[in-house]
Design a protein with these regions (language model features):
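Short, well-ordered alpha-helical packing segments
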Residues: 13, 20, 24, 106, ...
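Internal mixed beta-strand/loop scaffold within catalytic domains of large alpha/beta enzymes
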Residues: 58-135
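Conserved small/polar residues in nucleotide/adenosyl-binding loops
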Residues: 167-169
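N-terminal accessory/precursor segments of enzymes
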Residues: 114-162
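Short, surface-exposed, charged/polar-biased interaction segments
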Residues: 29, 33-37, 97, 126-130, ...
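Gly/Pro-rich turn-and-neighbor structural signature
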Residues: 2-92
Length: 169
């Protein structure tokens, strides 16, 4: 089934909202079920704040501070505008027409334990005269653990390989 560009944008935006809701629910369940240090603290719940972008679009920041997670941000945005002449030379499909549209999600989670690395993930759908998905993920350890790093990267690559034909950097 072919979707028009307008339908693709609508579907992508709705998918990111749904993904945000699923991710926030999963983090809140972990907070509710947690039974370790800081268990006397109240479980974290997400608070949401809407924002608008000058030039078009906006998003919603979802922030949680909890007893397992020191702080988690799950942010979605849908923005549009025109790339500068210089920048449009660097972006696929923007050389012919510098207008863009983008929708995406970003997740950053910091745990209380220094033994658990912070994690970041983002993915986005971008439309110029062409359209594509992009994104990535990483761990930021406070205490280096090569086993964690290798497990993370192999699991991430294995998942991507199941669904996508990508070059992994």
């Amino acid at each position: 089934m072919y979707l028009s560009t307008s339908d693709q944008k609508k579907e992508a935006t709705e998918w990111f909202i749904s993904l945000r809701d699923q991710i926030c629910s999963a983090f809140e369940r972990l907070e509710e079920d947690y039974d370790g240090p800081n268990k006397s603290m109240m479980p974290g719940k997400f608070a949401r704040k809407h924002w608008e972008r000058d030039g078009g679009g906006g998003g919603v920041m979802s922030i949680m501070e909890g007893r397992l997670f020191e702080k988690v941000g799950v942010n979605i945005s849908t923005v549009m505008g025109t790339f500068s002449q210089e920048f449009s030379k660097e972006i696929t499909g923007a050389q012919e027409d510098p207008r863009f549209w983008a929708s995406g999600i970003s997740v950053v989670a910091h745990m209380w334990s220094p033994h658990v690395p912070a994690v970041h993930m983002n993915t986005r759908h971008i439309t110029t005269t062409k359209s594509w998905f992009g994104g990535g993920s990483d761990l930021t350890p406070m205490i280096r653990n090569d086993d964690d790093r290798e497990l993370f990267h192999s699991a991430f690559e294995g998942t991507c390989d199941k669904y996508l034909s990508l070059i992994h950097i």
